[in-house]
Regions:
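ACP-dependent fatty acid/polyketide chain-elongation machinery
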Residues: 1-68, 246-256, 353-368, 411-414
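Flexible, low-complexity linker/loop segments at domain and module junctions
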Residues: 1-9, 96-99, 292-298, 329, ...
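Condensing-enzyme catalytic core mediating Claisen C-C bond formation in acyl metabolism
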Residues: 6-10, 34-38, 215-292, 300-301
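Conserved beta-ketoacyl condensing-enzyme motif
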Residues: 9, 24-26, 30-163, 192-203, ...
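A glycine- and small-aliphatic-rich helix-loop capping segment at beta-alpha/alpha-beta transitions
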Residues: 23-30, 114-128, 178-181, 201-214, ...
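Active-site-adjacent elements of ketosynthase-type condensing enzymes
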Residues: 44-54, 111-115, 194-221, 263-283, ...
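Active-site-proximal alpha-helical scaffold in enzymes
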Residues: 79-92, 141-144, 149-193, 232-253, ...
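Glycine-/small-residue-rich "gating" segment that lines the acyl/pantetheine channel
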Residues: 125-132, 170-173, 177, 186, ...
Length: 414
């Protein structure tokens, strides 16, 4: 049997629609802050959906030089800022001696969509010679990883996962596995996304995936509510620093929590719709629990994928019930997307951070805008107000277009 390393979280960073650092994000989760408002990043007048969950008042100059920021897409800026926050928080130092044992993996479902759109406009109106030479490096989805590695000097395993809305969670899970197997000593990992653009909003609207509550946008993201009608697109990044328990103890680091399980599957069913009954998601949950050697009674909280779409919320509820049976009704299940909107490939990162904050501060974030119970969604969704609770083990679900399913298991450190 291989000698698996225990893997702990020693640093966290977040850029979100409800807070641009960990302290702000924690307060937002505890108070049920609503991050949804009218779109300001472009003129949405011609669009059927005119609202989103934007990152607001971000002081990027504290992390990125002004000259550099002009050469980085918005999603990469979010990823690097959150990575620097997490790295600084961890107290980890990268030297020539350890650089090749420290890696980066930041998932993104879409990558540099803003760059792609703006340069396509230049190509169309001004011709090919006016297209920026930075176009390709700005828009490719691995560049948040690349820029973070350059900024921090991390020369170890480097990757960018692109499994749609499961990308951030896959990046964390894959990083966990690398450290567990001894292939790396530490990983900076999570997700980043910035798709609140004309094409991004129009594309999801045409797919009937978005809510169109333009008259009351702050009530639009309502996971598990009977009157849910689509998700609210968000943006931002959540990043963790993972490292071996031995390494963290050796340098006397603060340890937030331990990552103990990872399950990932594919529905192989449909390009956008989940498999009936959420069977693929259920299998990912089952695999994470088995990987963690957990009994079902140990799970204290589930951070749901909870997108506020009819299909996801119903099928995710079914998936949870198929695994936990009668105990499903005793486990608090909440969707922080009710506050942050759906960050697509960035969602797994900020939701992993939410689980870690839940473990360390003993509370469960709410599902806000939960007003009308749905008979098909009949679990405890922690409606509208955060709840004090002793949380020892938390699960985080992420499901993506293409049938990608991920479940991560976190626990207090023993």
């Amino acid at each position: 049997m291989p000698n698996f390393h225990r893997v702990v979280i020693t640093g966290i960073g977040a850029v979100t629609p409800i807070g641009n650092n960990i302290d702000e994000y924690l307060v937002g989760l505890q108070t049920g802050t609503n991050g949804v408002s009218d779109i300001t990043l472009f003129d949405p007048e011609q669009h059927p959906c005119k609202f989103a969950a934007e990152v607001k008042n971000l002081q990027s100059e504290n992390f990125i030089e002004a000259k550099e920021s002009k050469r980085w897409d918005r999603f990469s800026q979010f990823g690097v800022i959150a990575a620097k926050q997490a790295f600084n928080d961890s107290g980890l130092e990268i030297t020539e001696a350890n650089a090749s044992r420290i890696g980066v993996s930041i998932g993104s479902g879409v990558g540099g969509l803003l760059t792609m759109e703006s340069q396509a406009q230049i190509l169309s109106h001004k011709g090919p010679k006016r297209v920026s030479p930075f176009t390709v490096p700005m828009m490719i989805p691995n560049m948040a990883t690349g820029l973070a590695a350059i900024a921090l000097g991390a020369k170890g395993p480097s990757s960018s996962v692109s499994t749609a809305c499961a990308a951030g969670s896959n990046a964390i899970g894959d990083s966990f596995r690398l450290i567990q197997l001894g292939k790396a000593d530490a990983m900076i990992c999570g997700g980043a996304e910035a798709s609140i653009t004309p094409l991004g909003v129009a594309g999801f609207a045409s797919a009937k995936a978005l809510s169109f509550r333009n008259d009351s946008p702050q009530t639009a993201s309502r996971p598990f509510d009977a009157e849910r009608d689509g998700f609210v697109i968000g943006e931002g990044s959540g990043i963790l620093v993972l490292e071996t328990l031995e390494n963290a103890q050796k340098r006397k680091s603060r340890i937030y929590a331990e990552i103990i399980g990872y399950g990932t599957t594919c529905d192989a069913h449909h390009i956008t719709a989940p498999s009936p009954g959420g069977v693929g998601g259920a299998e990912a949950i089952k695999l994470a629990i088995k990987d963690a050697s957990l009994s079902l009674e140990k799970v204290d909280y589930i951070n749901a994928h909870g997108t506020s779409t009819s299909a996801n919320d119903k099928n995710e509820t079914s998936a949870i019930k198929s695994i936990f049976r009668d105990r499903s009704y005793l486990i608090p299940v909440s969707s922080t997307k009710s506050m942050t909107g759906h960050l697509l490939g960035g969602s797994g990162g900020i939701e992993a951070v939410a689980c870690i904050l839940s473990l360390t501060h003993n509370f469960i974030p709410p599902t806000i805008n939960y007003v009308n119970p749905d008979p098909e969604c009949d679990l405890d969704y922690v409606p509208n107000n955060a709840r004090e609770a002793q949380v020892g083990v938390a699960l985080s679900n992420s499901f993506g277009f293409g049938g990608h399913n991920v479940c991560l298991a976190f626990s207090k450190i023993n």
